[in-house]
Every structure is written in C-alpha cells, then in structure tokens.
UniProtKB/Swiss-Prot annotation:
Annotated compartments: Secreted; Secreted, Extracellular space, Extracellular matrix
Annotated glycosylation sites: N69, N125, N192, N361, N397, N550, N579
Protein name as it appears in the record: Galectin-3-binding protein
SRCR domain segment(s): 24-124
Signal peptide: 1-18
Keyword ATP-binding: no
Organism classification: Eukaryota, Metazoa, Chordata, Craniata, Vertebrata
Disulfide pattern: C49-C113, C62-C123, C93-C103
Main subcellular location: secreted
GO BP of this protein: cell adhesion
Keyword annotations of the record: Cell adhesion, Disulfide bond, Extracellular matrix, Glycoprotein, Secreted, Signal
Length: 584
C-alpha cells in the first residue's frame, strides 16, 4: 500500500529538522572521513564548486566534522556529482572559520559551476582526542530566568521619568559585574541605582536589564531607537553598535515614513552624524515615496532645506518635486522659509510649457510671484540662449547644480529592466502609489540569436540635454542586465567574474563634446523602495549584494529582505561640460 502524501512530506521535513544553515556533511565517500562536500542552506543540501578550492578550505570542513585536519582537497567531482544547487563558489577560507559559510566566497547560490566541478575532501582518520559536552547555550536563558524571578537580589534599580519613579527592579551584582555592558549599574558604590529614562522608552527598560543577564535581546523597528538611546546613555557599547547596524535594515520597513523621520530627529538631537547621514540618504533616494506617504505633511522645514539641494534626490521630474513642495506648504512655514525652499528648486530643469503653467497650478506662485518670475526668467534663458552666450554675457557657470539634473525617474529620462534569474520572459514591475492607481513598468527581453540566452534588455531614447534647444535631438540607449561572462561577451562588454552581475548601457547618436553624462542605476527592492544607487563607469553599473553575505561584492546601502532586487532603473543625466571661464 502506497503511503499517503502527508507521510512523504513528514519524511522530508524530518530529514532536515535540527539542521542549521552552514552545517556540512560528506557524501558518497565510502568512508566517514572522505566524500563530496555538501552544505545546508535554506532547507536544502547543496554542493560547493572547486574554484579556488584548496587544503585550507578542506581543513575547515574536516575540523567542523570532528577530524584533526584535511589531507587532500579534491575537485572535478572526485566522489561523484551531487544534486541540488551549487551553494558556494570561489570559497577562500583563512582556516579559523567554523564553517565554509563563514569564509569569503561569491555568496550563497551565486555560481557558474556545474556538478562536474563539485569539491571533495579527504580528512585524517584521527578524530580529535578531546570530546566536549557543551551546554553553554542554556546558560543565557538560565541567567535571564534569574532576572525574571526578581529574587535573591542585592541591588535596587529605580526607573525615573521626569523626576518621578515609574518602575522598580532588583538586580544581582555578582552577575552584572561579569558584564561590561552593565557597568553603569555597578561601577558606583551602594545598593541603589536610579535610571533616568524618557517616557517612550520605559517599556524597553525591562528587556535592557534582562539583556545584561542573558546577553540576548530582540529588537524591532519600533524599539530600535529606544534601545540605541538606552545603550548610549548607560554605556552598553556592543548593544549601541548593534542597533546602529540595524538602522539601515529597519529604515525601509515603515511605508508611512514616520519612523525614518523620527530616527532623523533623534540623530539630530543626539548629534549622531552617521545616523543622520544614513537617514538623509534613504530619504533622498526614496523621496518620491516620501512625498506620497502619510508623513509628508509633517516633514520639518529644516529637513527639506537639507534635502532639496541634493543632486541624488530621486523624483519623477523637477516639476513633480515643486508640486510636492506646494502640497507640503499649506500654512506651516513662514514666508522666508518657503522662499528658501523655492530657491533650491532647479527651474532650468523644467520645460518652458511647464514653467508657463506654474501660475495656474501652484498655490505658492501668487504668494511668491516675484521670486517665481525671477526663477522662470533664469530658466527660459537656459532653454533659449546658447550656453556660449550665457557664459559670455551673463557670467553663468553652467556646471553648477542649478543647471544639472537630479535623478529623474520619469520615462523621459529613465528605463527599467528586471533580474532575469527570477523573471519570466516578459515581465512587469507593479508599483502601488499611495495616492494613485497601480503603475506598471514593462521590460522587454532582447531577441538574441538562437544560441544566446535571453537577458532583460530595454531600448529607449532621451533628449540630448535638458535645455529646450536640444529637444529635437534624441539619443538612443540600450540597457541590459548581464549576469554572466557569456552575456557580457554577447552584448559587447568586458566583465570579470567578481563584478557580476552588472548593468550594461550603450549609447548611439547625439555626439556633442560639450555634453557629458553622470548616469545612475537604481536598485529596486520588492517594488517598495530604492535600496542603492550606483554610477555607470565605463558604461557598466555595479549591482551590489542585496543582503550582507561573505561575497567580495559590496553590500547594498539598505539591504533587501528578499535577497535579490526585483528590478533596476537606469537614469540618464546629461549636463554641460564647459563653464564661464573656459568659453570663447
């Protein structure tokens, strides 16, 4: 009788229970000390490619499995070809790691290998002479339970909010003195300690004190600021540093943008320059989403004054940016503050018809009419007068930011492709605007010769330059996602294995020695936020690792929880090369 389907599912699950990512085993070796190296990751076993495989790497495997060392590091599927995915490639260990997962490599599931390159090892027959029973993992919870009991204490801890007691705990000096993170509680003599805490952080104090015992703590988007604040105030340097690393992970998790704004305000108040810089970068790259978010009306004026001068502001267009400021304005800012913001708008980046319509579409216009007329005149000169005359008679430096584009994501200046490793041949990114309908961006795949693979490819055109003088002069572009060396060859690019995948960009037409380009590539995570922005250098743009791995590639500024980017937007950014001092 055939066992029911549920039974087989049970067998499958049972076979991987108790196995952790990075665990290793030897297969098909005919003896316990040799075989094909297999490593566990995300619920399944896979193999390791023999690229760069050496005795140091093999010894890490052998020691992890209880042997003294490795005697041979074998490749070319010496113990037969495995099945499942190639988990790791180009592994480079130092010899001290607990697992191959801790060694430098291309990262999980990133390999051009086939199973005929599976790595194997032969370990010494001798196992280690010392056998260890290690129950230390239970110690953390046991110490936490001592704190939970609130018994047998010799230290009184009062939690004070604005001069009034809010909570009380007791502690055990003998445990706390063993942890430098808790030194603020025991370095002063006496049996009484008072902690002054902001009201919003009171609910986190118990978890902080328990952390001093168990050395384990759970941190969420809503609690990270308070834990960072408490750790900073009470000298818990490891916790403080760990919270700092979480900000980049947690910032994108609040689509309302209240938390990023709150963290920015916290960074300014505490003088945390690194956190302030991180918040500004996230808000700049995701400025379009911010303007559509619930928190947009509450963005403080001083923050906008820092964001609006930036060239890395990602917005559909300069007109869209000005309209967003108009929506934000209302009655919240003074006349002088609003004028300061309008001064930072790049009017030359708006077309003449857009400039003309401002008087009919903006509530700001008539309350600041003189300023708008002045900025409009400046922009119209840029659009209608050749740059040589502007530089000669007006003394304008056309390389200033006012005359250069930001990161404009509208179809006029950008194109989108997806990652072919998970896309179908015809794909779409669907972005749900918080204030509008679904917007879909489609991406075609290049019809290559029959012996080629299909790779996401987009042909598009842009104006040669933002000036209206160039509106009839079009430049043709081709954007392609290149995941392999072969794909680079197919499309005329030279790539090395350690830089893949990359985006390739080619240009045809519109040659002008006075115009240069600073093109950008936006890494999009789950259609929800911009995780990173890279430059096109030599017509290629690097694609960072979506998550922090042991890969030699840099990690995305804001990690993508999915483990991959769902798409890439390329933005064309032309500008004049010359300035007033060099023009005849």
């Amino acid at each position: 009788m055939t066992p029911p389907r549920l039974f087989w599912v049970w067998l499958l699950v049972a076979g991987t229970q108790g196995v952790n990512d990075g665990d290793m085993r030897l297969a098909d070796g005919g003896a316990t000390n040799q075989g094909r190296v297999e490593i566990f990751y995300r619920g399944q076993w896979g193999t390791v490619c023999d690229n760069l495989w050496d005795l140091t790497d093999a010894s890490v495997v052998c020691r992890a499995l209880g042997f003294e060392n490795a005697t041979q590091a074998l490749g070319r599927a010496a113990f037969g070809q495995g099945s499942g995915p190639i988990m790791l490639d180009e592994v480079q260990c130092t010899g001290t790691e607990a697992s191959l997962a801790d060694c430098k490599s291309l990262g999980w599931l990133k390999s051009n290998c086939r199973h005929e390159r599976d790595a194997g090892v032969v370990c010494t027959n001798e196992t280690r002479s010392t056998h260890t029973l290690d129950l230390s993992r239970e110690l953390s919870e046991a110490l936490g339970q001592i704190f939970d009991s609130q018994r047998g204490c010799d230290l009184s801890i009062s939690v004070n909010v604005q001069g009034e007691d809010a909570l009380g705990f007791c502690g055990h000096t003998v445990i706390l003195t063993a942890n430098l993170e808790a030194q603020a509680l025991w370095k002063e003599p006496g049996s009484n300690v008072t902690m002054s805490v902001d009201a919003e952080c009171v609910p986190m104090v118990r978890d902080l004190l328990r952390y001093f015992y168990s050395r384990r703590i759970d941190i969420t988007l809503s609690s990270v600021k308070c834990f960072h604040k408490l750790a900073s105030a009470y000298g818990a340097r490891q916790l403080q540093g760990y919270c700092a690393t979480l900000f980049a992970i947690l910032l994108p998790q609040d689509p309302s943008f209240h938390m990023p704004l709150d963290l920015y305000a916290y960074a300014v108040a505490t003088g945390d320059a690194l956190l302030e810089k991180l918040c500004l970068q996230f808000l700049a790259w995701n400025f379009e989403a911010l303007t559509q978010a619930e928190a947009w009306p509450s963005v403080p004026t001083d923050l906008l004054q820092l964001l609006l001068p930036r060239s890395d502001l990602a917005v559909p267009s300069e007109l869209a940016l000005l309209k967003a400021v108009d929506t934000w304005w209302g009655e919240r800012a003074s006349h002088e503050e609003v004028e300061g913001l309008v001064e930072k708008i790049r009017f030359p980046m708006m077309l003449p018809e857009e400039l003309f319509e401002l008087q009919f579409n903006l509530s700001l216009y008539w309350s600041h009419e003189a300023l708008f007329q002045k900025k409009t005149l400046q922009a119209l000169e840029f659009h209608t007068v050749p740059f040589q005359l502007l530089a000669r008679y007006k003394g304008l430096n056309l390389t200033e930011d006012t005359y250069k584009p930001r990161i404009y994501t509208s179809p006029t200046w950008s194109a989108f492709v997806t990652d072919s490793s998970w896309s179908a041949r015809k794909s779409q990114l669907v972005y749900q605007s918080r204030r509008g309908p679904l917007v879909k961006y489609s991406s075609d795949y290049f019809q290559a010769p029959s012996d080629y693979r299909y790779y996401p490819y987009q042909s598009f055109q842009t104006p040669q330059h933002p000036s209206f003088l160039f509106q009839d002069k079009r430049v043709s572009w081709s954007l392609v996602y290149l995941p392999t060396i072969q794909s680079c060859w197919n499309y005329g690019f030279s790539c090395s294995s350690d830089e893949l995948p990359v985006l390739g960009l080619t240009k045809s037409g519109g040659s002008d020695r006075t115009i240069a380009y600073e093109n950008k590539a936006l890494m999009l995570c789950e259609g929800l936020f911009v995780a990173d922005v890279t430059d096109f250098e030599g017509w290629k743009a690097a694609i960072p690792s979506a998550l922090d791995t042991n890969s030699s590639k840099s990690t995305s500024s804001f990690p993508c929880p999915a483990g991959h980017f769902n798409g890439f937007r390329t933005v064309i950014r032309p500008f004049y090369l010359t300035n007033s001092s060099g023009v005849d």
